[in-house]
Amino acid sequence: MNLPPDALHENVYAFALARDQVESYCNQCLTSMAELKKCSACRRLAYCSQECQRADWKLHKVECKAIKTHNEVANDSIRLVMRIAGKLSRNEDGEIEAYYIPGVARNFQNLEHHPSSYDADEESFVKEYFQFAIAPHPDRDLIKLIFQKVSINSFVVGNSTGNPIGVGLCIKLSAANHSCKPLTRVCYRNRTAMLVPVSSELPSTLEGACHSYIDELMPRDMRRDTLKKKYKFLCQCDGCLDEDRNARMEAWTCGICVKGWMRNKENGQCELCGWTMSKDHFELCRTAEEAGIAARSRLANDAIPLETKRNLCEKLLDLFQDTLHDHNVHRIPVLRCLYICSLAAQNITAAAKTGGTLLSIMLVYQNTTDPAILFQKYQLAQLFCAAGAKTQATKLLQEIEEPLEKIYTPDSMICRNVYCMILKARNLS
């Protein structure tokens, strides 16, 4: 039986915008517009109308007092838990009933969670929560329970260009399982969350509308370690069981034909020319791989200056030359970091080159209609327009125009931007 059209859509049960986004989007409906009005009390959270501000007040009034007291906005996870506690105090558990929902009905109370006797992250969160919250406080065990459920059921909230702007919780859509080779991607039309199919293959059940809980463009062992630590399960999804795909993700470059790929093990053979890896080549490739793994934490460290990161990225890419295959996912964190560094330096040419290289790897493992691919092409098209490369920009924009219309509707901000860029590219000729 096919799912009804609205089965993979849901009005978010609760959400909280990131600190740096609370003044850029309406904190009730997630509309983005030039004229947002701030809350007259805390002067931090913004709204698109008085109607939205009144609708949000029952949740905002508790955090509003805390913001005024501390003269700062807490992080989005703390405020999301605070908002959910407010909803539960009014018996708003978000229950949804439908024949395709596991158990027919689903609400906050029956969301999965992983209770434990002691968890350092949980204890740290609870301590930080009560440092921000203003009395009267909810029960400490309730805050722990909400945190446990939010930790494994929440989604990143994004805007129509795929950029993260906060965190939210969906009651119905959180029933969808994980896959490292996802069938859907989480997208948003304002505060309506959607599980958007990444290809023509449509899920037949809500649980089977698998999306990736993590960045799936990592080696299998890293994916499994991440999932085990946060979600407490050993992943056995289609992506993890696809041996050829996983081997390609960590492939090394052939030392003879260069274009061929080899499994990252001693005596590996090139899948193209059949050459058996020499001991010297094995050591070179192993060194490059270990360097890429070791650099991940430094590349993700915001305290390290971008110029330092840029130099590290360039050295790593030199090391990866003729060792890690062009489609090896260990390249991705390096390329993402270098892309950000190039944008920060306003080096449009370098950013476009790096973004294009990143896209070529993504296309090996993700479908052309996957929103992740569409957003990457959208960013590249913006760079090509800025650089005056009309042919490249037009090609990308035409490829993403129709898929984005299906996801967001022709009147959405991202689609209007695409139309404007197409016109701009034509005027460049």
Swiss-Prot record:
SS bond partners: none
Which annotated residues bind Zn(2+) 1? C26, C29, C48, C52
**ZnF (MYND-type) ranges:** 26-64
Tagged with keyword tRNA processing: no
Against PROSITE patterns, the record matches this protein to: ZF_MYND_1, ZF_MYND_2
- Residues binding Zn(2+) 2, per UniProt: C39, C42, H60, C64
Tell me the keywords, alphabetical order: DNA-binding, Metal-binding, Nucleus, Zinc, Zinc-finger
Q: Which Pfam families match?
A: zf-MYND (PF01753)
Keyword DNA-binding on this protein? yes
Q: Name one GO cellular component term.
A: nucleus
What Gene Ontology terms describe what this protein does at the molecular function level?
A: DNA binding; zinc ion binding
The record's InterPro entries line, in alphabetical order, gives:
H3K4_H4K5_MeTrfase, SET_dom_sf, TPR-like_helical_dom_sf, Znf_MYND
Q: Where in the cell is it found?
A: Nucleus
Q: Which SUPFAM superfamilies match?
A: HIT/MYND zinc finger-like (SSF144232), SET domain (SSF82199)
Q: What is this protein called?
A: SET domain-containing protein 14
Q: Give the organism, scientific name.
A: Caenorhabditis elegans
Question: Which lineage ranks, top first, belong to the organism behind this chain?
Answer: Eukaryota, Metazoa, Ecdysozoa, Nematoda, Chromadorea
